[in-house]
């Protein structure tokens, strides 16, 4: 089973992934947690390039770097793990590319979708949890975590984090459009709820989905 978590930076994905992985392992399941970009030696090196604040990367270059990282991760790690029956939990997948590079950077969606199809080989998540929080609130969380002032030119921010509020508003609206296109795959959760409330929703949803598959 492939489970993905999506949402703008600061939504709380990493926390929920850790809790879900621990929950599933406690039930005796084999679980692999991964992040995008990353997960292989090549992909982690691409991640460093993408997030380095001194790099000035064009939107198309950014898209292709993310896609190269994804192609490596899918073929080298995700597909083999799924074949062995491992539950894979992924922090971001191609929906992030659609939201960030498509809606955020303005890349033509048909072109973007072709590149996504090539990099994933058609692999899709079984379920995607979207942690919904307004960009303004998410960014306040993010800056608070780093204990830095709310300023996008701060040297402690990575290249993506320096993109600005208008960019994140476009990304947020992009996610809303994506979910409307595939409502059966997405589970939208209010990210302003407590960590435990969100976790309970996630585990309950997965339990119900698995019960539905077995019936």
From Swiss-Prot:
It comes from the Bacteria. It catalyses: dTMP + ATP = dTDP + ADP. Its EC number is 2.7.4.9. Keywords: ATP-binding, Kinase, Nucleotide biosynthesis, Nucleotide-binding, Transferase. It comes from Chlorobium phaeovibrioides (strain DSM 265 / 1930). One of its GO terms (molecular function) is dTMP kinase activity. Phosphorylation of dTMP to form dTDP in both de novo and salvage pathways of dTTP synthesis. PROSITE patterns: THYMIDYLATE_KINASE. ATP binds at residues 7-14. The keyword Kinase applies. This is Thymidylate kinase. Gene3D superfamilies: P-loop containing nucleotide triphosphate hydrolases. InterPro entries: P-loop_NTPase (IPR027417), Thymidylate_kin-like_dom (IPR039430), Thymidylate_kin_CS (IPR018095), Thymidylate_kinase (IPR018094). It is an enzyme of class 2 (transferase). Belongs to the thymidylate kinase family. GO terms for cellular component: cytosol. GO terms for biological process: dTDP biosynthetic process; dTTP biosynthetic process; dUDP biosynthetic process.
